[in-house]
Amino acid sequence: MSKYFAESELIINEDGSCFHLHLRPEQLADKVILVGDPGRVSLVASHFEEKECEVESREFHAITGTYKGKRITVQSTGIGCDNIDIVVNELDALKNIDFKTRTEKPEHTTLTLVRIGTCGGLQLNCPAGTFVASQKSIGFDGLINFYAPVSYTHLRAHET
């Protein structure tokens, strides 16, 4: 039996969109680029061959379109892990919950999420404007404890 999500657990707007992002399930691609600043959504989407839809609500801005024939959504998260938590939960709900019946879909869809952003740096050999690709990240806010057990392999201390 599928899990049911009460109105208090999953707020769906009158137009069938999720509460914060204002996206409807059909507007979300399986591949999502996350950016912090809402202004960067248009910058990234300017590389799309075609724009299918654009939705804005507060600090959340999304554009879905195609790039090299692949359907992609660019979604802003705003600032902080609390906003990222809201965004990722609503993106997952859009793909894995039937908004008409408020139940889990029988087949789970795993989204591909790629975060593009900026950060400060402390290393002299890495001047401003340098492109950096992280393999891992570490958070000291404790949010990961709600999603993965402490023994999760990718979260273990990295020895240098």
What is each of the regions a protein language model found here?
Residues S2-N89, K100:
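N-terminal short beta-loop-beta anion/metal-coordinating cradle
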Residues T153-T160:
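Conserved small/polar residues in nucleotide/adenosyl-binding loops
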Residues V88-N145:
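Hydrophobic alpha-helical segments and helix pairs
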Residues G36, I116, A157:
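Single, functionally critical "micro-switch" positions that shape active/binding sites
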Residues L10-E14, N96, P149-S151:
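Extended interaction regions within the primary functional domain
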Residues A62-I63, A93-L94, H154:
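Juxtamembrane/interface motifs at transmembrane-helix termini
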Residues T64, G142-P149:
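Short, charged, surface-exposed secondary-structure boundary motifs
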